[in-house]
Structures are given as C-alpha cells and as structure tokens.
Amino acid sequence: MAAVSVYERPVGGFSFDNCRRNAVLEADFAKKGYKLPTARKTGTTIAGVVYKDGIVLGADTRATEGMVVADKNCSKIHFISPNIYCCGAGTAADTDMTTQLISSNLELHSLSTGRLPRVVTANRMLKQMLFRYQGYIGAALVLGGVDVTGPHLYSIYPHGSTDKLPYVTMGSGSLAAMAVFEDKFRPDMEEEEAKKLVSEAIAAGIFNDLGSGSNIDLCVISKSKLDFLRPYSVPNKKGTRFGRYRCEKGTNAVLTEKVTTLEIEVLEETVQTMDTS
C-alpha cells in the first residue's frame, strides 16, 4: 500500500483545523501581495418548511445593488411546474434565467412522460446545471413541491451541492431564519402553524440583515391546492407624515448675492440647397 489511513477516535468540540489552514494561506498570500477572496453576500432571506400535508416556501421582497435598494417589491418565488416552486437568492438575473430554463426543460419532460414531474427530477436538473458552471452562476435556491411520493424540500447551492431537509434557509439572512426554525420547528405541523413559522423566520432575516427587507411572500403547496400569498405580511410599513417638512420661500435670508454677465457671441449662418438636377 502506498498510503495507510489511520483511524482516529473523534473528539468532542469544534475543530479549528480549517481556521488555522486559512490563516496560514492568508499569511502566505499576503507575502506575495495577494488577497484571499471574500464571501459574496446574496442579500436575501428565503426559507421553506415541510408540514403535515405539503410545503410552505417564503421569501422577502428586497432587491439590492451593493448597498442600494434597487427594488422594494420583487418576487423571489419562481414557478417551476404546477406542483413545484423555487425560491432564489443571489444574482437576480441568474436565479430568474436558471429557474426559467429548468421550468422549460421540466415541461418538456412532463409532456414526454405524460405525468406531473417529480421534485427530485427538478432537483437533479438544477444541481447538474449549477455544477457544470462551477459556482459562476450565482443562484442559491430553495426548491419545494409535492408529487406522488409526498412533499419534498431541497436547498441547492451555487456549486451544485444539495441538501434534503425538513426545513431549510438560504441567503444572507439565513442564520437568523435558521435560529427561528431550530427553536420552533416540530414535525407534522398544521398549515397555519407552518405559515406562521416561515413568516417569523423571514421576518427574523428582514430585521437582522440589511440585505433583506420589505414584505414577506409565501407559497403553500399541497396535493389539493396551491396558494401564492403575495404579500402575506408587511412588517415594514412606511410611517405617516404628521406635518409639512418643506420650508416656505424666503424662510432663509440671502446673505450674499453676485450677478455675473455672460458674454455671448452670435454667429449668423446661411444654408443653401444644393441643386441635384
């Protein structure tokens, strides 16, 4: 054998090996004048949960351009098929085009097989496409739906890795949303319970992350119905103005005034038509 793998008994506690490795790499790069790439913030909170009869997906509605709010009411819950929807975080153009492409391919697959597509099929299509581009398509997705095998919920990362869990969160506000899920989630919840839980999780992301904000959208998918609730709630209502804040003309005194005359040179031009006959 060229190499021998020695089994080590696992020890309790968090392992800081990767932290030490990153510190060594950062110091080595600094000597050569390079900087390690920083994590890219997606500026969104999206989440999903499995309840007794189906799936509840949720998202905020703020779209950002750096530190500027570009859109206060954008829709981040995308149609994949009549029984499957997908929340998108990351680059808005990438999430829109990726979900449209997969929705189109899934419709062709459905017409070919003559049945409603399965959620695992959509998951496989998405992960294969994203893995092919090695993370350069900035689409972090939460895929949920109900098919003949029951409700399914997946989180899909931009590099193509996926998780199948009873509750998932993605985006820059995902840590706050996950804290709510880990505290209040329980199996086999009723629909209203699940909607309230997802709403609280998205609200936690909105109030604890600058990249998330505005309203909360929900999508409820079950075998018997599909409810798209936009908006489900508005946690950030604009305050009412109680007075006028515009000063009347003449309120501030003019301290200095200077009038400068402009020298204008007037040129006269004549235009003659050319005879083309």
From Swiss-Prot:
Keywords: Cytoplasm, Hydrolase, Nucleus, Protease, Proteasome, Threonine protease, Zymogen. InterPro entries: Ntn_hydrolases_N, Pept_T1A_subB, Proteasome_bsu_C, Proteasome_bsu_CS, Proteasome_sua/b, Proteasome_suB-type. The gene is PSMB7. It comes from the Eukaryota. It catalyses: Cleavage of peptide bonds with very broad specificity. It comes from Bos taurus. This is Proteasome subunit beta type-7. The 26S proteasome consists of a 20S proteasome core and two 19S regulatory subunits. The 20S proteasome core is a barrel-shaped complex made of 28 subunits that are arranged in four stacked rings. The two outer rings are each formed by seven alpha subunits, and the two inner rings are formed by seven beta subunits. The proteolytic activity is exerted by three beta-subunits PSMB5, PSMB6 and PSMB7. One of its GO terms (biological process) is proteolysis involved in protein catabolic process.
